[in-house]
Amino acid sequence: MFDYSTTTAAIIEQAKTREDALPIRNEKCRSKFLFQPHPAPKVFLFFHGFTAGPYQFEPLGEALFKAGYNVLVPLQPGHGIAGNWDGDNPPPMPEDIQVYQQFALEWIQQAQLLGQQLFVGGYSTGGTLAAWLAQEHPQAIEKTLLFAPYLSGMNKLVDWLVEILPIYYEWLNKDNPGNFGYEGFPIPALRIFLDMGEQILERAKNTPATPMLIVSSESDRATNLHEHQELFEAVLKCQPKSWYRCFEKELHIPHTMMSEPEGNHYLDLLINLTKAYVESDLTWVEIEKMGYSAIANNK
């Protein structure tokens, strides 16, 4: 028989045991779980970005928890592991997409027990993984939240290099005060998400998915905004309750948009937009009739 308190306690304890054994590189990288004392009306399962950790969803997760919802942000496979990682000794990140897919499926099974409606979301490559789930299991998910999803990069030459080079890449912003993850990664570990992004765009043309909120920024130098729009337009045909928001260049919101330490000085815009979307039944047509400023100003 299902017992909510026992289940949530087990989720927390199992994650702690697993991460203690890694060992964890920084306490910020640990899985984040925010559980109400009883099953919640809404449950949010979030996937963090590439080489990063659950800390990216702390601000949004805390806002949703305060609104009365359950939040799960599990540490992804091969992430957050302590070690002296570099080009000669790269972090042990998966190079088989099935590792991430199985991970996502296991967590969706756990999360859907904890409330009435399940929302799945992700940032960057975590958004790619969430989009895959939205296409694979739309019947289990109420809505999907994609923040700067990595469907491909801004530069086609870089995409081509990602496809062919087996090298190690070090992040240019590795010294960012909001970064507690790896400073670099082996290119093949990113390639699998590039391939998945291409498949998601192709499948979106004829595969039903959940309603989606897709969030972009004109200052994002890592992802392709045109492909965010392409995905939105494809999903909108079947799911009229999908929304799209692209933050203006004047706001200088970078790809790392999920927290202020990572560079988003207008984080309230993202949080308020997300809360408005998950609590609304408005269609995109209705939003457009109200005026684009209804989203832009989160009124």
What is the meaning of each model-derived region?
Residues 25-79:
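Short, surface-exposed "cap/lid" segments of acyl-processing enzymes
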Residues 37-38, 185-254, 263-298:
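Serine-hydrolase catalytic core
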Residues 145-156:
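Active-site nucleophile loop of the alpha/beta-hydrolase fold
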Residues 121-126, 130:
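Gly/Ala-rich beta-loop-alpha elbow adjacent to hydrolase catalytic centers
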Residues 1-39:
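N-terminal cap/lid segment of alpha/beta-hydrolase-fold proteins
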Residues 157-179:
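A catalytic-pocket lid/entrance helix-loop region that shapes and gates access to the active site
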Residues 83-114:
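Catalytic nucleophile-loop/oxyanion-hole region of alpha/beta-hydrolase
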